[in-house]
């Protein structure tokens, strides 16, 4: 993870994206927005469930690639933003 606000879970299967998100959230301040990049379709549901269980807020999910840009491995990447609450 090069940007402290980005959790790059592209190419990983669940539950790995949630594990990485939880690790990043552990040291983040209240109100921090983390962006999770993922390719596993189950990640969207799992991120939402994780956020609800911990009182965080999912701000939205959108395509990660620019329109017309082909995904590197053939799987479209998405990004979900989560605002942390303590």
What are these regions (language model features)?
Residues 1-86:
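Domain-level signature for proteins that mediate thiol-based redox and metal-cofactor handling
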